[in-house]
């Protein structure tokens, strides 16, 4: 006749299976939870806004920043894309906007601002953050005002306009710092207990169009 496993062996097997199940739960928890932890200051803004934009947008707590507390949920595209703007800006700056896209295929956060460089001519600076790749892309275009604004993206033409008005890559860096670091990120740190700061972004890759101009 077959020998039945002793009670002690059966108890040991139960303990082993229980331990394995516990380890599996811990691994699954880590796999799910830790990737969602913000790796940088832009992750913080993106994730906290994603949590609140349909109920009571956290960015409404920024003084002088206008955004709907509850973003409309209709429309196939715009329902995922809250957008707000500052009412007051430093001198020579226009239309400072902060926007998002929470649709997974197009995930992003952006800061865009226009700066007047001459009558009828502006720089449009865009800083886009991709939460999937943890990358910030900084770029600029020239805007020529008219009945309808025209936008110049061609890099050679953009550089030509900048040279015409004596604007250097160092100047562009200072514009970025003044708006993104000293305005948007500083405001974020004033309403949220951030682990990061305007001088310490955290784990993020930065790509700057004008880096070698």
Q: What is the predicted function of each stretch?
A:
Residues 1-12:
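Short, Lys/Arg-enriched N-terminal segments with co-localized hydrophobic residues
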Residues 82, 86-213:
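Extracytoplasmic electrostatic interaction patches
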Residues 1-3, 57, 113, 159:
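Exposed boundary/loop context
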Residues 30-116:
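N-terminal export/targeting and maturation segments
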Residues 10-11, 39, 118, 129:
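Intrinsic-disorder/low-complexity regions
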């Amino acid at each position: 006749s077959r020998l039945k496993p002793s009670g002690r062996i059966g108890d040991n097997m139960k303990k082993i299976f229980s331990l394995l199940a516990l380890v599996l739960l811990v691994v699954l928890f880590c796999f799910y939870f830790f990737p969602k932890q913000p790796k940088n200051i832009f992750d913080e803004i993106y994730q906290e806004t994603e949590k609140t934009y349909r109920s009571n947008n956290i960015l409404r707590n920024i003084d002088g920043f206008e955004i709907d507390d509850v973003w409309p949920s209709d429309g196939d595209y715009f329902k995922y894309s809250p957008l707000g703007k500052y009412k007051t800006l430093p001198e020579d700056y226009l239309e400072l906007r902060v926007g998002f896209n929470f649709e997974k295929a197009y995930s992003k956060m952006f800061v865009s601002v226009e700066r007047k460089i001459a009558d009828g001519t502006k720089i449009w600076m865009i800083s886009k953050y991709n939460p999937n790749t943890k990358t910030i892309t900084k770029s600029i275009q020239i805007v020529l005002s008219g009945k309808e604004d025209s936008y110049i993206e061609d890099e050679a033409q953009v550089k030509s306009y900048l040279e015409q008005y004596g604007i250097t890559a160092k100047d562009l860096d200072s514009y970025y710092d003044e708006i993104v670091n000293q305005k948007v990120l500083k405001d974020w740190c004033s309403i949220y207990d951030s682990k990061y700061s305007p001088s310490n972004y955290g784990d993020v890759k930065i790509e700057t169009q004008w880096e070698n101009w």
